[in-house]
Amino acid sequence: MSTIIDVYAREVLDSRGNPTVEVEVYTESGAFGRAIVPSGASTGEHEAVELRDGDKSRYLGKGVVNAVNNVNEIIAPEIAGFDVTDQAGIDRAMIELDGTPNKGKLGANAILGVSMAVAHAAADFVGLPLYRYLGGFNAKQLPTPMMNIINGGSHADNNVDFQEFMILPVGAPTFKESIRMGAEVFHALKAVLHDKGLNTAVGDEGGFAPNLGSNREALEVIIEAIEKAGYKAGENVFLGMDVASSEFYNKETGKYDLAGEGRTGLTSAEMVDFYEELCKDFPIISIEDGLDENDWDGHKLLTERIGDKVQLVGDDLFVTNTQKLAEGIEKGISNSILIKVNQIGTLTETFEAIEMAKRAGYTAVVSHRSGETEDATIADIAVATNAGQIKTGSMSRTDRIAKYNQLLRIEDELGEIAVYDGIKSFYNIKR
């Protein structure tokens, strides 16, 4: 047993230059843990509360001094004396201390920072890598990466409506080879865009953010890049999209406005028709948040139409929340959940969501946020839970590469017992 003797938080910066919370946990044994909390740009309205100061004279109101103070002055005294390996007990104590359904009092960014730092300190205490400490001996599956190589929507300053266009190197034999394939397609895409006279600047998640004429054109240039890199789309590499449709859903009209394509006032059924058409024309294996987070009828229709052959991921739809996920499972909506630790605010609740998804035959995709840091905890979480898939950005920006590099280290450490399932990680659809 090693008890917690001190918890300390500070304000640091994320990849967008905005403040976020870093937490350190100290124990009587000398074991130590540190973690930094990520932040999202497009957020679901049902997410746990990210506490910001709102003081416009500091960081344009985005400071997190209040969250930091909540850790140092309220949470730290409460969990001092806890056994550092009592993750569930510590998380439960913080949830009760907050006392709100959405962690709105202390802030999910305060609570999560402590939750993750505790796990790191516990792993340090028992002398195990984080993935092994959290997942035990069965933690050995490397995730199939979903690489966001074209950014649009709220992640980029361009006229592409959909937020992310991804490549999934499912044909690779190992995680290491999947990274190589992804990097080669990324560099091929840069050349394709350059030759077309398009911008090769990158967005928040490291993908390119060119001013393309339509969402379809984004898919077309990616296909061209896959072929230029020497691979076959629909065989070695598949495509994925995070539509983030809540960002262009008009709540007043109840319709969808694809401004970049000059198409406005689309109904849910028309959006479903559009996705079905795209899936016929391109090897799309995954669509995230195809309809607004509150358009459950639309999600149901999408699931009925293409859910047998396309992974339909709920991000804003489920917000890593077991209550929302249970409702979706009961109603037969989507077939996958995106897992973002800061949407729910503790590791314990994160693992509960992953387990619930798996029991129901849903896939689970561990995900970064658009505002990231050098913290690579989610890489260990993906392996610890054998989630099978990870979404952590493109092949550029250190805040994204940090996760890939950690996964490469884990694969190397696992050696012959490492598993990379590739296409088999999409176990609930027919391909």
Curated annotation (Swiss-Prot):
Pathway(s) per entry: Carbohydrate degradation; glycolysis; pyruvate from D-glyceraldehyde 3-phosphate: step 4/5
One GO-annotated biological process of the protein: glycolytic process
Listed Gene3D superfamilies: Enolase-like C-terminal domain, Enolase-like, N-terminal domain
Binding site for Mg(2+): D242, E288, D315
Cofactor(s) it depends on: Mg(2+)
Residues holding (2R)-2-phosphoglycerate: Q163, K340, R369, S370, K391
SMART domains xref list: Enolase_C, Enolase_N
Cofactor note: Binds a second Mg(2+) ion via substrate during catalysis.
Residues passing through the membrane, by range: none
EC numbers for this chain: 4.2.1.11
Active site location: E205, K340
The keyword Lyase belongs to this UniProt entry's keyword annotation: yes
CDD domains xrefs: enolase
GO cellular component: cell surface; extracellular region; phosphopyruvate hydratase complex
Chemical reaction(s) catalysed: (2R)-2-phosphoglycerate = phosphoenolpyruvate + H2O
Keywords: Cytoplasm, Glycolysis, Lyase, Magnesium, Metal-binding, Secreted
Source organism superkingdom: Bacteria
InterPro entries according to UniProt: Enolase, Enolase-like_C_sf, Enolase-like_N, Enolase_C, Enolase_CS, Enolase_N
Function: Catalyzes the reversible conversion of 2-phosphoglycerate (2-PG) into phosphoenolpyruvate (PEP). It is essential for the degradation of carbohydrates via glycolysis.
Cited PANTHER family: ENOLASE
Family membership noted in the UniProt record: Belongs to the enolase family.
Protein name per its UniProtKB record: Enolase
Organism encoding this protein: Bacillus cereus (strain G9842)
Gene responsible for this protein: eno
